[in-house]
């Protein structure tokens, strides 16, 4: 098979498990916590590194912001051998008791985005793989980390999340909002692959604190610290999968 047109990888270039942050800068941050790493390819928003952690080989690939670019990453990585996708990103809290720096493991994602709907009807569930979900939760518990576990929402319009929308999501007891998980979950399910997601809270929309970091350099200090903790949880989950 020829190199994929956007990720510029082919069969044999990547491993079966991939961590997929949004921010290309976070690829290096994840790689720095691994035992060794090697740059595989870099094009547009996609930076791909192979690494190993505690004896397990993995690939790290940024997806950029939003579901369209995340879908390209999942599509092309799955064509060259990736079977498990773990999103490690940031989110905005939708419940008043959640603070900046809290971590969320998603049990499902409401489809307030357009990409997954090009693949299937909105009625089809966007849910993580059971093993990916339980290993993320288990890795957090093994490290005595406090996390929120529950449903989230994936949305396309970062700057158009109105008070009405936020109130509706809050009333539905959705925990947080981000921009990629619904499509990652839906595509993985359709392909018979595994996917999970853990996100660090970088703002609270109910409290009026707009989530506002496009990169790790812009995150509040507490969120920066907990992004690293979320990365470690994800890496430990990788070794169990």
UniProtKB/Swiss-Prot annotation:
State the temperature dependence of activity.
Optimum temperature is 30 degrees Celsius.
Provide the alphabetized UniProt keywords.
Glycosyltransferase, Transferase
**Cross-referenced Gene3D superfamilies, in alphabetical order?**
Nucleoside phosphorylase domain
The record's listing under Pfam families reads:
PNP_UDP_1
EC number from the UniProt entry: 2.4.2.1
Q: Which GO terms describe its biological process?
A: nucleoside catabolic process
GO molecular function terms noted in the UniProt entry: guanosine phosphorylase activity; S-methyl-5-thioadenosine phosphorylase activity
Presence of keyword Metal-binding: no
Which reactions fall under this protein's catalytic activity?
Answer: guanosine + phosphate = alpha-D-ribose 1-phosphate + guanine; a purine D-ribonucleoside + phosphate = a purine nucleobase + alpha-D-ribose 1-phosphate; inosine + phosphate = alpha-D-ribose 1-phosphate + hypoxanthine; adenosine + phosphate = alpha-D-ribose 1-phosphate + adenine
Q: Which InterPro entries match?
A: Nucleoside_phosphorylase_CS (IPR018016), Nucleoside_phosphorylase_d (IPR000845), Nucleoside_phosphorylase_sf (IPR035994)
Q: How does activity depend on pH?
A: Optimum pH is 7.5.
Q: How is its activity regulated?
A: Activity is higher at low KCl concentrations.
Q: Name one GO cellular component term.
A: cytosol
Q: Say what the protein does.
A: Phosphorylase involved in the non-carboxylating pentose bisphosphate pathway, a nucleoside degradation pathway present in some halophilic archaea. Catalyzes the phosphorolytic cleavage of guanosine to guanine and ribose-1-phosphate (R1P). Exhibits the highest activity toward guanosine, but also shows lower activity against inosine and adenosine.
Protein family membership: Belongs to the PNP/UDP phosphorylase family.
Which protein are we looking at? Answer: Guanosine phosphorylase
Which species is the source of this protein?
Halorubrum lacusprofundi (strain ATCC 49239 / DSM 5036 / JCM 8891 / ACAM 34)
